[in-house]
């Protein structure tokens, strides 16, 4: 009998230890689903999100909405901390940090995304998109998913959503820009991007890639003749003080990608992943609407400041003038992919 009781006691102890072990092995995700009496959940992940822009930017408007939606819908289990003004590094540094795990999340422009997947530069081809509806269809459709998959598979970085940085336009302090022929002989500052350089060259312009921080002064002292960028940046950075002519040619659309490191992403429960992904999408709508709905007012403001704007250029003339850029890069990015994007239904 004593032997039986001893065996029984040993069995109970083994089962008890096994139960304790099973509890300790419970995935963090299961524990994180516990709801407190006040309806909140304990925070189990804090995601630091970086941007190179300041709190007055449309990008911050979107990130603040992302923060609100994530924290509200996860009941506080997932917290978002936003770092502005390049506090987590430049966009290029954040791109590298996302792959190394030293950056949790970041909002990156297309040239920085291309550091993770070089073929992402396909979106820099001139006059690739007809309008915002075309843009939205492409990035929410198969081409956008293609690059989500590529970057996840190769870099273990997830694109949560594609946001907006607008169509880029040329401006100068020399003369009105009525057509592509008016670009000949200009020295234009561009980002360090081979497609942008080829586009300017096709228009007969030469280029400089000086730092954006130096651009206002360079325009002021006429070190460069002009620059290019979206309307909201032209207003925000006061280029209307040193550039009096603009054409709304929309030669390149610049997408922004809200990205997250794969290890951070995989810390989230499946339910919270859905919440974060949906929050990125909904916040992206807010960011896009803020940029797009403000353009008419910004154009009016620029005209009040004396800027002469060609609002309705002959887009086909600009496409024809830069057709050689497609010949130059079709092998690099693939003619089929380029055609798919150009002709994507919207």
State where each predicted segment sits.
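Signature of the catalytic double-stranded beta-helix
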Residues: 138-149
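Positively charged n-region of N-terminal signal peptides that target proteins for export
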Residues: 1-9
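N-terminal secretory/targeting leader peptides
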Residues: 21-133, 143, 152-153, 157-346
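C-terminal motif of bacterial Sec signal peptides marking the signal peptidase cleavage site
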Residues: 16-19
């Amino acid at each position: 009998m004593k032997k039986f009781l001893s065996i029984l006691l040993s069995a109970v102890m083994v089962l008890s230890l096994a139960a304790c072990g099973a509890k300790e092995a419970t995935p963090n995700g299961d524990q994180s689903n516990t709801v407190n009496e006040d309806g909140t959940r304990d925070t189990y992940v804090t995601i630091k999100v970086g941007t190179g822009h300041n709190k007055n930017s449309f990008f911050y408007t979107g990130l603040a909405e992302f923060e609100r939606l994530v924290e509200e819908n996860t009941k506080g289990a997932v917290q978002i901390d936003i770092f502005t003004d390049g506090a987590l590094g430049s966009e290029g540094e954040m791109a590298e940090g996302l792959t190394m795990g030293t950056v949790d999340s970041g909002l990156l422009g297309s040239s920085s995304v291309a550091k993770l997947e070089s073929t992402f530069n396909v979106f820099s081809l001139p006059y690739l998109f007809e309008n915002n509806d075309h843009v939205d269809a492409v990035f929410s459709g198969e081409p956008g998913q293609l690059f989500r998959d590529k970057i996840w598979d190769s870099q273990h970085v997830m694109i949560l959503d594609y946001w907006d940085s607008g169509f880029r336009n040329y401006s100068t302090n020399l003369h009105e820009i009525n057509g592509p022929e008016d670009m000949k002989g200009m020295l234009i500052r561009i980002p360090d991007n081979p497609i942008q350089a080829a586009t300017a060259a096709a228009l007969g312009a030469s280029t400089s890639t000086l730092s954006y921080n130096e651009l206002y002064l360079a325009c002021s002292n006429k070190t460069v003749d002009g620059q290019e960028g979206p309307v909201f940046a032209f207003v925000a950075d006061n280029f209307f003080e040193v550039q009096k002519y603009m054409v709304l040619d929309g030669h390149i659309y610049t997408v922004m990608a809200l990205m997250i490191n794969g290890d951070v992403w995989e810390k989230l429960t499946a339910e919270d992943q859905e919440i974060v992904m949906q929050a990125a999408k909904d916040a992206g709508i807010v960011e896009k609407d803020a940029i797009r709905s403000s353009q008419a007012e910004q154009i009016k403001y620029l005209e009040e400041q004396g800027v002469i704007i060609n609002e309705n250029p002959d887009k086909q003339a600009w496409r024809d003038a830069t057709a050689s850029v497609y010949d130059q890069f079709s092998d690099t990015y693939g003619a089929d992919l380029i055609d798919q994007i150009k002709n994507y239904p919207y």
